[in-house]
Amino acid sequence: CHTRRQRQMCIRDRDKEEHIDFLINNAGAAWAEPFGAFSEGGWDKVMDLNVKSIFFLTQELAPLLRVKGTIDDPSRIINIGSIDGMNVAAFETYSYGASKAAVHHLTRQLARRLIDENILVNAIAPGPFPSNMLGAAVAHDYSEIAKRNPRKRIGTPQDMAGLAIFLCSRAGAF
């Protein structure tokens, strides 16, 4: 949902809902090109989807999050960042790392702004896990990336799901 038209499509059914309990901003894209050839279009595509869409979709859906959020059981927003927003990636994905660093900072700003409205905002910054995006970069051979991890493996969808469930549950309300 990185353009105004796409955001409108994402929220077209918003009026059918009385409230939402949580929002998970999980859309993301990467772009890899050598430094000297890195295109403005690739940069903009990544920044628009990874950062801009999070802000504007959150802005549009905040009224529905405010409805049921209480001091004891706030509504939740989870933004999916990346370790590449904190570390320098091995690939020439300049806009990806910058966008995920922006997601982490935007998360802190939104958390500060929305807490008084009983909306908690957190980010998950996963390491590598099987995905079309990473798979394309490594020809779906994750063995070298796994070797760089102290656990000698890459993450799984269940690793991410467990944390998201915790953050959206009553256990993550404080």
Question: Locations of the language-model features?
Answer:
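C-terminal substrate-recognition "lid" of short-chain dehydrogenase/reductases
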Residues: 119, 153-174
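Substrate-binding pocket helix/loop in short-chain dehydrogenase/reductase
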Residues: 34-35, 42-47, 134, 145
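Residue(s) in the substrate-gating loop at a strand-loop-helix junction
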Residues: 82
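Alpha-helical segment proximal to the catalytic Tyr-Lys
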Residues: 63, 112-116, 173
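A glycine/serine/threonine-rich, flexible loop-to-helix segment
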Residues: 92, 116, 123-149, 159
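Single conserved hydrophobic/aromatic residue that forms the stacking wall/gate
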Residues: 1-7, 11-13
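Active-site helix of classical SDR
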Residues: 58, 99, 107
